[in-house]
């Protein structure tokens, strides 16, 4: 199913998925883990594209240090403001992801906290 999410929602979803999958204290069944990994794979290109744009903007508005690492100096508020404006445009833009929505019975009563369930909410459907 195709669903539209803002890039910032995709980033948040990726964080929740990664946290659930990597947390040894959360015991989820193998099928749910498989489904969550598949969803992560489906949004991977959007995460990578965001990182590319963000890094390009850091290089554009920032300066490199002696190690060749770019950063935007707080001494240059104009550059930081332009960077934030550019990144906000990307974060607020919509992307389409094609996934099979999670069914409520796949995630409820599976040991996931309410915080995790809230993070998964955009991809839980009937």
What label would you give each PLM region?
Residues 1-126:
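A composition-driven surface/loop motif
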């Amino acid at each position: 199913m195709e669903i539209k999410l803002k890039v910032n929602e995709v980033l948040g979803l990726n964080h929740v998925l990664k946290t659930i999958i990597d947390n040894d204290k959360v015991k989820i069944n193998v099928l749910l883990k498989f489904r969550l990994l598949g969803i992560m794979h489906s949004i991977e290109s959007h995460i990578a594209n965001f990182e590319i744009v963000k890094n390009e903007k850091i290089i554009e508005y920032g300066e490199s240090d002696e190690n060749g690492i770019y950063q935007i100096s707080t001494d240059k508020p104009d550059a930081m403001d332009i960077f934030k404006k550019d990144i906000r445009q990307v974060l607020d833009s919509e992307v389409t992801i094609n996934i099979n929505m999670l069914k409520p019975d796949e995630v409820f009563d599976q040991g996931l906290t309410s915080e995790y369930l809230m993070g998964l909410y955009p991809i839980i459907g009937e």
